[in-house]
Amino acid sequence: GRLAQAAQEISDGTAANLLVRRLGGPAGVTARFREMGDSVTRLDRYEPDLGLVLSADLRDTTTPAAMAQLVRRITTGELLQRDSRDRLLGWMRNTRTGVHRLRAGLPEDWLTGNKTGTGRAEGTTNKCNDIVITVPPGRSPIVIAAYYDSGEYTPQVERRHEAVLAEVARIVTDWVAG
């Protein structure tokens, strides 16, 4: 449990690598995705190499739609027992990464958890991704996945890149408010 919690809450790459090894390596994780009904997402490398994302490279890829569908199925009880699902949702709500991404554009009274993804390496463009499960008061859960390619390389994730994802969440908020 502690490895999964660290991988989720603070994006601990070492913890994630240990979990991936326990699941049979990247191929084992990809096989699990297939078992869960995700025919798109694939894992091919360990951290930190999977953060090196080249435009035409299919390794370590997914789509926002595939990830949103998978997260919806995991977090709404279709794939996990209730206690495991509740534990994961708690970790997602306690996640310390991504506070300036999708979460920043959602109302504070919406119960929200997230998981970020970031790709950056010299010679590539920064990728700034986030997925949230959020519950507006009195409403059903909503899953939002947004992936942003900044078109540039910077040594750190820039707040202006994260702001694009916050704007996506504001648009969803306006849509939900109707």
Where are these regions (language model features)?
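Mid-domain, small-residue-enriched loop/turn segments at the edges of structured enzyme/sensor domains
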Residues: 1, 20-77
